[in-house]
From Swiss-Prot:
Its main location: membrane. Keywords: ATP-binding, Cell membrane, Membrane, Nucleotide-binding, Repeat, Translocase, Transport. Its EC number is 7.-.-.-. Belongs to the ABC transporter superfamily. CDD domains: ABC_cobalt_CbiO_domain1. It comes from Streptococcus agalactiae serotype III (strain NEM316). It is found in: Cell membrane. ATP 2 binds at residues 328-335. It is an enzyme of class 7 (translocase). The lineage of its organism: Bacteria, Bacillati, Bacillota, Bacilli, Lactobacillales. This is Putative ABC transporter ATP-binding protein gbs1680. InterPro entries: AAA+_ATPase, ABC_Co_transporter, ABC_transporter-like_ATP-bd, ABC_transporter-like_CS, ABC_transpr_CbiO/EcfA_su, ECF_ABC_transporter_ATP-bd, P-loop_NTPase.
Amino acid sequence: MKDFIEWKDFTFQYDVQSEPTLKGINLSIPKGEKVLILGPSGSGKSTLGHCLNGIIPNTHKGQYSGIFTINHKNAFDLSIYDKSHLVSTVLQDPDGQFIGLTVAEDIAFALENDVVAQEEMTSIVEMWAKRLEIAPLLSKRPQDLSGGQKQRVSLAGVLVDDSPILLFDEPLANLDPQSGQDIMALVDRIHQEQDATTIIIEHRLEDVLYERVDRVVLFSDGQIIYNGEPDQLLKTNFLSEYGIREPLYISALKNLGYDFEKQNTMTSIDDFDFSELLIPKMRALDLDKHTDKLLSVQHLSVSYDLENNTLDDVSFDLYKGQRLAIVGKNGAGKSTLAKALCQFIPNNATLIYNNEDVSQDSIKERAERIGYVLQNPNQMISQAMVFDEVALGLRLRGFSDNDIESRVYDILKVCGLYQFRNWPISALSFGQKKRVTIASILILNPEVIILDEPTAGQDMKHYTEMMSFLDKLSCDGHSIVMITHDMQLMLEYTDRAIVIDNGLIAADDHPINILSNTELLKKTHLKKTSLFALADRLGISPQKLTQWYIDNQGGKNG
């Protein structure tokens, strides 16, 4: 069926805003197509998704003009009940989507609302649990699962409805690299088996393109900039111009002077012809030069039950000015490590800080030394307004109003939030809330800053601004610890990486060496970046190519 979903000259403006968020949108999506909606923060892509699933106009009110139809019916005339049977949404944060006390109850929720008979309901739940490989988890609490498992449960909970439209709102935001790849493969399989119209809203272009998409729609400032095949988009400079991270191999090939005009297929490195490509001389890997020890963690173990250690005898040192990545699969113990370092979780570790034993610190005393930004911003926010949230720590420490205003404005500008200084936090996106929490910790200037997934949900512009700011802090002597699933971040912006696997340190090395260890990557659910695949095709050292890439990106690493 042609034009299953259609926006024609469609404009939408929230009641609380003075300018339209969507401006003259013309977009048609045929039935069964798989479309990626791409764009920087604030571009309007999430608003488009909210129009599609009924959050607009049922929850978020506003004014619209033009035409928006689903299956040739005015979408805004459909009840939220009717819309729920047309569009199934998998949210960015699966914890916000769970209803049931067990996985089975959660999957069955939509069926219960439709008064499906118990026997049929059980059969449907078991069928989808088996297809999504979560059958052994049916009796578990959703909140106890890993990130990848949570996404599968969320997906099962919407697939039981058999809706013709599947909407994914940044499904990769909180997943380790291998789990993200697995989810994209699963989405592609479901798309093909169900013949569903599949719409993916996502920042991580390269990860989405791991599987085929029919079309990419690029948004900026509420307008469509590009609407076409991914291969053609990758030949343009639109991605870098509009704040979207290019696939690593595309950026590297541009720096190498590769002629894309003769290239038909851009989404697979295997399809490129490198016979005429000239390879410049490349230097050896930079070594970490940090030697001034700031923090020594000795024999850290954490157990949530009597049988298993979440962390088992973890020891490592952290140096002044060092940028350290903590990586590993979902559920490996990375966030537990951060919480233990901040005294949020009882532990018997010995901590030596600036040659002083601080193992008996209170939480308040530890906070003066180590700042921690949580992965989920909603768990940190306590104030209604952006300014008040960022200013709270300074107010509790007795700073003057003038000093508070000056410092808050400075940090908001750095974090790309100055224009929202008088906004209610409830009006911000997930990525914007994340920046608010980062700002609230950075303003206190702790010597060690731990950030749990600092760039999750951030577009390239704000990602680059944030990482450049963290680089400046490290140059000033701050030690930056980043818990991340982003292998490109680890490559470009850290000096060292620790891999956690099942509560143990599996590796502690330079990021490039970590990503060169195929056996380690497979074991710990990490994956090589496309630079390594490109190096294999070019027949050169992946370490040298990666160092060359970093040098040509402005020398951000080191």
